[in-house]
């Protein structure tokens, strides 16, 4: 869920304006941190193209990103770029145009059984009149009890009470609150992807992003 003003504005634009395609630029030297947003973007029903930036530095460090496998795991087209050197920019733009023609991105990630049961029930009970490609994102946000989404949908007390039973059942089974369940399961999913797709030669060495963060926060 977004908390900063910038995140709220960006999310509202994507949901309300429903652009033809999302070009998701991620830092290849700190891939794991960036994938959390990517998993959310793929649930919006909008085609997603990932541009992995700083690939020149990734290769210089002799790290390995299995782009083909990463693309398969996430269900998105991936292009390697170096914004600083201007490499791959046109390829990313062309990939975005092609993705817009093809249509929606199908999210590859599924949550645990209890969560998926609740999400399916929410889609059926609340979101059946909404465009199909937007239903999953809204259902996940309802499951998380996202205040802004609930305010926008303005659901009746009866409907809220109905779906709350499934949410509470998932919370009881997984022994956590709904928002934390979604967050934790995303991170577990991302960790499994990184394990299979990202090999870091310089284990223990700080990435460029981490170095910047360290300077800024000290």
Language model features: what each stretch is:
Residues 209, 213-217:
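Alpha-helical membrane-interface segments at transmembrane helix boundaries
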Residues 1:
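Conserved nucleotide-sensing/catalytic segment adjacent to the nucleotide-binding pocket
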């Amino acid at each position: 869920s977004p908390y900063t003003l910038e995140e709220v504005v960006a999310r509202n634009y994507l949901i309300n304006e429903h652009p033809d395609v999302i070009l998701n630029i991620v830092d290849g030297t700190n891939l794991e941190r960036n994938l959390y947003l990517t998993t959310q973007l793929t649930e919006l029903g909008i085609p997603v193209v990932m541009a992995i930036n700083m690939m020149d530095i990734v290769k210089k460090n002799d790290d390995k990103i299995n782009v083909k496998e990463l693309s398969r795991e996430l269900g998105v087209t991936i292009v390697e770029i170096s914004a600083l050197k201007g490499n791959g920019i046109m390829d990313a733009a062309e990939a975005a145009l092609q993705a817009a023609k093809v249509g929606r991105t199908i999210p590859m990630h599924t949550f645990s059984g209890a969560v998926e049961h609740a999400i399916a029930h929410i889609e059926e009970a609340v979101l059946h009149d909404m465009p199909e490609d937007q239903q999953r994102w809204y259902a996940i946000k309802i499951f998380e009890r996202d205040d802004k989404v609930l305010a926008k949908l303005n659901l009746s007390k009866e409907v809220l009470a109905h779906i709350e039973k499934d949410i509470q059942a998932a919370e009881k089974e997984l022994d956590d609150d709904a928002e934390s369940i979604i967050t934790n399961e995303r991170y577990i999913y991302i960790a499994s992807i990184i394990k299979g797709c990202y090999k870091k030669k310089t284990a223990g060495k700080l990435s460029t992003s981490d170095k910047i963060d360290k300077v800024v926060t000290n």
